[in-house]
Amino acid sequence: MENLKKMAGIKAAEFVKDGMVVGLGTGSTAYYFVEEIGRRIKEEGLQIIAVTTSSVTTKQAEGLNIPLKSIDQVDFVDVTVDGADEVDSQFNGIKGGGGALLMEKVVATPSKEYIWVVDESKLVEKLGAFKLPVEVVQYGAEQVFRRFERAGYKPSFREKDGQRFVTDMQNFIIDLALDVIENPIAFGQELDHVVGVVEHGLFNQMVDKVIVAGRDGVQISTSKKGK
């Protein structure tokens, strides 16, 4: 599995050219993309500026001497490469298993090209088997939790080391065990209207390309948006 992730990450790095502003994703597959960018800077003299999607990726990039700017210091991002936890046939996805969904969506939005790197196990017919992360402000989080409970969404606060997990933006995450999401676009809109919700892990029709590593090698699928 790790080898598949590495293949996808290295393939994605081919889309990065000199002079670009590059969004560095977060997660186990995006990790290999960041490593490959670091190698190209060191060995090939690749010249880019990068923006990161989490404190974890920032630390990795700094260790590789990748030049960084904050998202507010750039007007746009040429290409962002990130992982995904699930991807359906309509190019909708669930992200946020690593807890970085808010920053990931903030960086993805001004990106001219948005690419996901996944192994074939992440491809699904319908989203929902992977718990859907919802980032909520700490104030009133229990109110939001109870609202989700009443709706039958089987919520649970994400924890780390026996404490509630706190994101880089100092918010909590409520994971929803939905099993299947019949209409990701409508459900995303519903969550957008819940007071106290900062962001959710549904990335609907945002991605341009999905790079999939599997037993038959690396395949690249392009969405309608990316054509």
Swiss-Prot record:
Active site per the UniProt annotation: 104 (proton acceptor)
Superkingdom assignment: Bacteria
Molecular function terms from GO: ribose-5-phosphate isomerase activity
Any Gene Ontology biological process: pentose-phosphate shunt, non-oxidative branch
Keyword Isomerase: yes
Catalysed transformations (reactions): aldehydo-D-ribose 5-phosphate = D-ribulose 5-phosphate
Cross-referenced Pfam families: Rib_5-P_isom_A
CDD domains: RPI_A
Annotated EC: 5.3.1.6
InterPro entries documented for this protein: NagB/RpiA_transferase-like, Ribose-5P_isomerase, Ribose5P_isomerase_typA_subgr, Ribose5P_isomerase_type_A
Keywords: Isomerase
Binding residues for substrate: 26-29, 82-85, 95-98, 122
Pathway entry: Carbohydrate degradation; pentose phosphate pathway; D-ribose 5-phosphate from D-ribulose 5-phosphate (non-oxidative stage): step 1/1
Family: Belongs to the ribose 5-phosphate isomerase family.
Role played: Catalyzes the reversible conversion of ribose-5-phosphate to ribulose 5-phosphate.
Assembly and binders: Homodimer.
Record-given protein name: Ribose-5-phosphate isomerase A
